[in-house]
């Protein structure tokens, strides 16, 4: 059996991609014809009975030539085709033998279901060959009536069941020679349980040993006919080829429309786990008011106060206490094909299990944590170090309670851990390089360019620094950072005016974003907040020097505004205050990173693209097939985030400074900062002043800091994506009219703007899809955000944040010098500044929970699909698309070498030097695990 190389773990339906003018295609003609595996026009033909097939080599290509030997046979076939009869009605001389091979992946759930009584019925169906009903669909209509041609149908019978959970079914068809091209296969699951259909391969032979295979990649769940709701079609269709809407063969148009209609749903009712319906809703499921009034949260999206992207509608009933909110009962629905593959799911559950034990078991299983009080600080830095030196033993199975049933399944995967201490935290990579790097100002500054939040730093373009907030509410707009103070810290080498003109001053500006929430956050227990500004100076060797930190508390009815500027100092007291000020800024940056750079810009903002694509782009649409790999697992991980991470009393609220106001802050950031046109990497760099357009420079940009590892490597990836997408778009859209006239494409983009991001629908900056160039740029931006942007801010989280003093998620105490000064707190600070800093850091529980979560989020699964990888190659596309993708893959491999070379270049001090972690987050490929590199196709964790 001839089969294409497929990814066996993907959980998505993806049809074979080919152009409208060429493909491997099964075509059954009624007159003289030629079939070729080259790219002829008209498409490839496989002739009917009475034809003779030969094979030739021509200019390095294999060519199959089929010539009709009998005109009478062709005439007979033509008459049979006109009758529209299926295979059972065909005369033997007027048919072509076609074999279909269906590959089914058996899941662990399926194996468990094999114990059900209904399995016996399924076995009987397998035995008599009535498990899977397949129908071949012609691309043509009946010439006389203009109606659909009758499908050619057959039951598939089980022929193989291997040791790897793959079951093979085969079906034989007698296809009329006048049937025309096979455009699709309709599948009906006659078994009592759902099945995961990996692929279908149709083989047509001439009886002389020559054959042509038409592969159809499915990777989709097919529900059993018995479980389909009344009124819902119980069949699934899988298309054989990509077509733009206007080029869709007449015989497939109604199928195309019906499949889209099914995925849109009717906007009513509660969605079930086996549905494949995509629809929109606001974020009204983050709170849980029915459980506790303190867990109520505002609805995000659909209002001027809290604008937000939309998420997938679940249809769960409204809350009893707040009808605007949705109840949180049961699992969060995502369309069936958006679920994790079982490999991904098992590994995610394994890591989550380890994480739960990391966070909860230490109290009983080690001497690490003697008190699980949420607010207990670490007693010493020595104890922090023991997180990586002493393991936490896995308790006996009998002590695991509800985990008892799943641990035996996972223990096999844990056997490679050293001894019994299988829950040992791995030492983060930056600590392995330099245990004390977190104390150095140089590392603090370097991580703004080569850490996990390289999107925050910006150029200082005016001085004095001024707030845009209302001074009547928040105090004087002008910053307390003076020119004299900065010039002193710059060692008087130049004036502030000169530094600005030479683009030597840079800033982390968390002032206006956080200041309006300072008092709200301070009203909560065991956390605090400031508005902050942090200033850096670009030295002659291309590194940044940390100059000053300004912390601001706005005025309140009971207190005046307080603000103070902190600087590096050799004075002992001031140096400890400096360390505490840096801890506050690091916590601000951690919140900005997790809530905005990571969650909002990659997870949350991408979900509307996925929903709109599935509602408006047919799965046979070339743009759907281009984008689909970049949407893998995103909806599922977002649903998990809503359930566990960003929900009321979830991990984010537990562990980050804004606590219950975390998601509100992300809504404020969406309102003030998010723009689609600024999500492209070049536009983002220019917006922050980190680059300026220069047609003579590489990538058309001149960076403000030459050694900016994220920008330098990221631009290589951006250009590679752009080149690939431009080639793909050019293959299908020759001119502006072809883009503007694509009704599915235009409906997709309209829905992204007016529904998915409906709170910004009238913004003037939305691009128009009116040319191949604008389409390619828009698609490049989507791919960049889903793949490279996410990789840059996700897969280094454990390396940089696993040792939490380097990147505390929360600052829990105010500065000891904040007025009015608490005399007792000041005395404790002076007596034991080390303890004061540890009390400001996350508590033991907060730190270990965050460490465990960052470990999970930073992990690549074994079934990861990487940018430019072989798993998502457009398998059956024409030569132009195949060559473009091969070039894309080759370029990404070249980029890996370029990045390796840069990391060894000692002139690049922001990525090479003693104790410095090399910048590898933009390296495209990776092994499984926590590696600090690798760009998956999608925002998949």
UniProtKB/Swiss-Prot annotation:
Lipoxygenase domain location: 242-941
EC top class, as a word: oxidoreductase
Comp. bias intervals (Basic and acidic residues): 319-331
Transit peptide: 1-67
Necessary cofactors: Fe cation
Transit peptide is among the record's keywords: yes
Pathway: Lipid metabolism; oxylipin biosynthesis
The keyword Glycoprotein appears for this protein: no
Ligand binding (Fe cation): 598, 603, 790, 794, 941
Disordered, as annotated region: 1-22, 45-68, 255-274, 288-331
Main location: plastid
Catalysed reactions, semicolon-separated: (9Z,12Z)-octadecadienoate + O2 = (13S)-hydroperoxy-(9Z,11E)-octadecadienoate; (9Z,12Z,15Z)-octadecatrienoate + O2 = (13S)-hydroperoxy-(9Z,11E,15Z)-octadecatrienoate
Keywords in alphabetical order: Chloroplast, Dioxygenase, Fatty acid biosynthesis, Fatty acid metabolism, Iron, Lipid biosynthesis, Lipid metabolism, Metal-binding, Oxidoreductase, Oxylipin biosynthesis, Plastid, Transit peptide
One CC-aspect GO term: chloroplast
Subcellular locations according to the entry: Plastid, Chloroplast
EC id: 1.13.11.12
PLAT domain: residues covered: 100-236
One of the record's GO molecular function terms: linoleate 13S-lipoxygenase activity
Cofactor: binding comment: Binds 1 Fe cation per subunit. Iron is tightly bound.
GO term, biological process aspect, one: oxylipin biosynthetic process
Family: Belongs to the lipoxygenase family.
Function: Plant lipoxygenase may be involved in a number of diverse aspects of plant physiology including growth and development, pest resistance, and senescence or responses to wounding. It catalyzes the hydroperoxidation of lipids containing a cis,cis-1,4-pentadiene structure.
Protein name per Swiss-Prot or TrEMBL: Probable lipoxygenase 8, chloroplastic
Source taxonomy: Eukaryota, Viridiplantae, Streptophyta, Embryophyta, Tracheophyta
